[in-house]
Amino acid sequence: MNRTRDELAAAAIPPVKVPLWTRDYMLACCANLMMGLAFFELVPVLPLYLTGQLQVSSGWLGWIMSIYVLAAILSRPWFAHRVDSGDRKKIYVTVYILLALSFSGYAVAATALMFFATRFIQGLIWGGMTTSGPTMAVDIIPPSRRGEGLGFFGMTMTLGMCLGPVIGLQVYQQYGFYVITWSSLVLCLAGAGIASLIRAPKRPVQEPVQETPKKVLDRLVLRVGIPLAVNVMIASFSYGAVSYTHLRAHETRGNL
């Protein structure tokens, strides 16, 4: 098939690369990094504090650490619906502030049951954070660079996963557990302030529709995504083992 002169000229022009590192995208990455640092600096020291200071049994320790993830799983479907139907930025900033305030629960908790309740409440909030944050990032990233943008956005959480435990253990050894809880609170408040500066694009208001229970279930559980979800779940078991190594090393004093 012959091509016209205009088509040949248009094909010869290189495509314009849409900028990725915009002001709003960098703010979203910084806010995500703050959240990662605040969360992961507490991960390695919480078992040490519970077993060392409160003499919590291994059974209670397992429940306290795992209830966080279970609560996040429970809250994510509800937050996913709210994010799709509401103001994503408002939800993100509000949940971010709630996450910051939830760290104060560690400062006042004095029993295993209080830590369990704090972890459950914070897990519910964490489910909203990990749902609204990436969703708003998708709105900011240009569609032509979505894969690259989500890759760098996810790397900020990975960076927090790397630096957070190092910072947390150093602060715990020098200043104690309560300084970490307040530093996590401050990091989250700073992250919420950064998130509030993001100029999220306006989305059309969706009209409410009547949904049958089957449609609701199909929307919440994407059947084609189940195999990928199983793969992620299997890979997450390794993280559970890694998060326990620092406690095991502390118990054996390095004689593994």
Task: Describe the residue ranges of each PLM region.
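Helix-breaking motifs and short loop linkers at transmembrane-helix boundaries and internal kinks
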Residues: 55, 87, 108-110
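Residue-level signature of mid-helix packing/kink "hotspots" within the transmembrane helices
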Residues: 69-77, 161-162
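Cytoplasmic helix-loop-helix junction between adjacent transmembrane helices
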Residues: 120-155
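C-terminal membrane-cytosol helix-exit motif in multi-pass small-molecule transporters
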Residues: 186-205
